[in-house]
């Protein structure tokens, strides 16, 4: 019960002994306590001491923000799910850690992205780098970026290599549009170049990414809710906001219009960091409310278990979860989350995963590579993860930069290549909501249910808490539960 007392204390509320003993005897004191805090705040937060008499009073007063259901939630008696896992690396992710695996990994990446680039009409006549001759021939080549740098005259040099050789590509700063485009090129991505061969260099006239075609909008007769970065077990986990979300999705919270939207939700997609984890960063134990990883997942099972069973929940791990650190991450191991695995409507998949939700191709990726992209590319930031997602789509790779903050497993196949263009790309990690529709693809970052951490305060990162994006029959809506 010290945890319950702490919950009230963090909200500036003390508990009299009689109220404490009554709470202790209740079936679910944690949930009741959270509900009481919500009710106290909704009444102006004027009470600083919770008494037994106030318990009686609160249980007789409806929260004005909470509308009691006027009958059962109107959802189909039996739902037919047309759910398909298109890509899940949980059981096909292998590496021995030998140098041969790393060579195979980069060969896989190069081959996959080269095939995509070769389909571009501008690169139909591309030739191997080793076949480049002297003179001033107009050429097209495809290669992996080995290095990117500026010269002392502020021209851009891109070192390209393929399976036959290497070449330096020059982008003149007088070509403003192309130079600006070249500033978004990062190491280890695969690009195509059209230009003129001049001595040891190719002077670029155009640079091509694998890119994405504009896709046709997918018709939907249902809704999908998206969340991520719940961080259960942290002292900064916003349990009250999460409980409001659960009540809403169950049809017990919100206006009639909001309850109608809840009834339409068929899928809930969770993009990682379900729990806060253990030993993720130095000093984390000081910020934990639950210091055992098994107990964190037990609490997660309690909270997610309250979500109505006619919603299919699709869940992947993030860097705070108990899966391995290197991407692609297999699904959360059952040995750490047995109670969570007992919830029959949860599908546990890898990070990343590609699924079909009644025909809506949904690519789910936690988003750790956003750190590398924000540090490497001018104009990209955590606050605008939609722009990062746009770049990753154009590069057709979820984590193009190797060897920086995002650990990548050197496997025989690169599973982070975006082979198939999704209708939805759902991410998390940065704790800041973002949305953009790009070439018909819904780019969604679902924010967090964790308030600002000490780390975020240092870097002035302001999270958007308790804001849940819902794709309502093809139209994006944002619900706030904070």
From Swiss-Prot:
It comes from Methanothermobacter thermautotrophicus (strain ATCC 29096 / DSM 1053 / JCM 10044 / NBRC 100330 / Delta H) (Methanobacterium thermoautotrophicum). One of its GO terms (cellular component) is DNA polymerase complex. This is DNA polymerase II small subunit. InterPro entries: DNA_pol_a/d/e_bsu (IPR007185), DNA_pol_delta/II_ssu (IPR024826), Metallo-depent_PP-like (IPR029052), NA-bd_OB-fold (IPR012340), NA-bd_OB_tRNA (IPR004365), Pol2_small_arc (IPR011149). Belongs to the DNA polymerase delta/II small subunit family. PANTHER family: DNA POLYMERASE DELTA SUBUNIT 2 (PTHR10416:SF0). Possesses two activities: a DNA synthesis (polymerase) and an exonucleolytic activity that degrades single-stranded DNA in the 3' to 5' direction. Has a template-primer preference which is characteristic of a replicative DNA polymerase. CDD domains: MPP_DNA_pol_II_small_archeal_C, PolII_SU_OBF. Keywords: DNA replication, DNA-binding, DNA-directed DNA polymerase, Exonuclease, Hydrolase, Multifunctional enzyme, Nuclease, Nucleotidyltransferase, Transferase. Heterodimer of a large subunit and a small subunit. It catalyses: DNA(n) + a 2'-deoxyribonucleoside 5'-triphosphate = DNA(n+1) + diphosphate; Exonucleolytic cleavage in the 3'- to 5'-direction to yield nucleoside 5'-phosphates. Its EC number is 2.7.7.7, 3.1.11.1. GO terms for molecular function: DNA binding; DNA-directed DNA polymerase activity; single-stranded DNA 3'-5' DNA exonuclease activity. One of its GO terms (biological process) is DNA catabolic process.
């Amino acid at each position: 019960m010290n945890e319950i007392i702490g919950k009230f204390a963090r909200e500036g509320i003390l508990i009299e002994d009689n109220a404490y003993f009554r709470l202790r005897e209740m079936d679910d004191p944690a949930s009741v306590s959270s509900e009481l805090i919500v009710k106290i705040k909704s009444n102006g937060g004027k009470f600083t001491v919770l008494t037994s008499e106030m318990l009686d009073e609160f249980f007789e007063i409806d929260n004005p923000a909470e509308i009691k259901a006027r009958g059962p939630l109107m959802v189909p008696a039996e739902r037919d799910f047309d759910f398909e896992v298109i890509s899940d690396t949980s059981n096909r992710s292998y590496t021995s850690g030998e140098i041969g695996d790393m060579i195979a990994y980069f060969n896989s990446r190069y081959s996959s992205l080269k095939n995509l680039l070769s389909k571009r009409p501008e690169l139909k006549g591309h030739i191997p780098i080793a076949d480049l001759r002297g003179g001033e021939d107009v050429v097209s080549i495809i290669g992996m970026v080995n290095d990117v740098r500026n010269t002392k005259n502020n021209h851009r040099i891109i070192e390209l290599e393929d399976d036959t050789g290497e070449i330096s590509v020059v982008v003149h700063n007088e070509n403003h549009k192309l130079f600006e485009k070249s500033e978004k090129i990062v190491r280890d991505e695969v690009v195509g170049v059209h230009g003129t061969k001049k001595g040891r260099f190719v002077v670029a006239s155009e640079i091509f990414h694998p890119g994405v075609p504009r896709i046709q909008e997918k018709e939907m007769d249902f809704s999908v809710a998206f969340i991520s970065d719940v961080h259960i077990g942290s002292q900064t986990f916003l349990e009250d906001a999460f409980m409001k979300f659960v009540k809403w999705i169950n049809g017990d919270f919100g206006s009639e219009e909001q309850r109608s939207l809840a009834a339409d939700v068929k899928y809930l997609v969770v993009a990682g960091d379900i729990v806060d984890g253990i030993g993720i960063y130095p000093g984390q134990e000081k910020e934990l409310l639950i210091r055992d990883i098994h107990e964190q997942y037990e609490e997660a099972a309690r909270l997610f278990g309250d979500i109505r069973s006619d919603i299919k929940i699709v869940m992947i791990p993030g860097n705070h979860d108990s899966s391995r650190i290197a991407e692609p991450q297999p699904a959360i191991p059952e040995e750490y989350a047995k109670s969570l695995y007992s919830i029959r409507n949860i599908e546990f998949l890898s990070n990343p995963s590609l699924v079909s939700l009644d025909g809506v191709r949904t690519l789910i990726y936690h988003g750790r590579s956003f750190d590398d992209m924000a540090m490497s590319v001018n104009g990209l930031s955590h606050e605008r993860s939609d722009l990062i997602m746009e770049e990753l789509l154009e590069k057709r790779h979820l984590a193009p930069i190797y060897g920086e903050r995002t650990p990548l497993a050197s496997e025989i196949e690169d599973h982070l290549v975006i082979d198939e263009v999704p209708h939805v790309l759902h991410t998390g990690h940065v704790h800041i909501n973002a949305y953009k529709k790009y070439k018909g693809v819904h780019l969604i970052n679902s924010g967090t249910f964790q308030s600002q951490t000490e780390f975020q305060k240092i870097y002035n990162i302001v999270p958007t808490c308790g804001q849940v994006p819902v794709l309502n029959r093809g139209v994006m809506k944002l619900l706030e539960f904070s």
